[in-house]
A protein has these predicted regions:
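Glycine-rich phosphate-binding P-loop
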Residues: 1
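Rossmann-like S-adenosyl-L-methionine
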Residues: 4-5
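P-loop NTPase motor domains
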Residues: 9-14, 18, 23-202
Length: 202
């Protein structure tokens, strides 16, 4: 019932109603899932076993996109290749100092969509790529709502949470949201909270 909103705003906190579309957590902004990945820990999720922040985040993105849409392994592998290309275009690598990055320094989902669309338009069947033209088309169809369409208001944009010191997420409206949107939004919130706990604390 958003009973915490007035108190949160009174002390200078941020009340983020997830369904209002005002506040966004950029899913393409790398988040910290573990402060020391162990590749030999087979009981841990894949993202936790990666040793670098970017590798952890790309692994998280694979699960995030699965939560949003029933993509096949081939679709997810294609998205992973496209995400890696996008980060390379933006100069984001394993050696990037993420502590110096601002929210505006990261690509957003519409940038990813534009990249995939360009790859689709320029597809060369003689180039022997790892992905097919049909896969690109299906990925574009599956991601359109999140990147450009009705769901973009919840996912497409730079992170604009005004305070992580006192932050309340309003989830009431999510009860009536489509299951795939709800799952993806909660997954995204979890990544944001994990990152703040591991990098900032409190």
């Amino acid at each position: 019932e958003h009973e915490q909103q007035e108190m949160c705003e009174a002390v200078g906190g941020c009340f983020a109603d997830l369904m209002a579309g005002k506040y966004i957590i950029n899913v393409l902004e790398p988040k910290c899932w573990d402060d020391g990945g162990d590749p030999d820990d087979t009981a841990a999720p894949e993202a936790f076993r990666k040793s670098t922040l970017l590798a952890q985040h790309v692994s998280f993105l694979k699960d995030f996109f699965r939560a949003y849409k029933d993509f096949s392994d081939a679709h997810i592998d294609t998205i992973e290749i496209m995400v890696s290309k996008l980060y390379a275009q933006w100069g984001i690598t394993e050696r990037t100092n993420f502590r110096r990055m601002r929210p505006e320094d990261y690509p957003i989902l519409s940038d990813l969509y534009d990249l995939i669309e360009e790859e689709f338009k320029r597809y060369d069947p003689n180039a022997h790529l790892l992905y097919t033209e049909k896969l690109l088309q299906e990925v574009l169809l599956g991601l359109h709502s999140m990147c450009k369409g009705a769901d973009a208001q919840f996912f497409n944009g730079h992170t604009n949470i005004t305070s992580s010191r006192f932050l309340v997420f309003g989830v009431k409206g999510m009860l009536s949201a489509a299951k795939n949107v709800r799952n993806a939004m909660l997954f995204n919130v979890l990544s944001f909270m994990s990152d703040k706990l591991l990098t900032v604390g409190n």
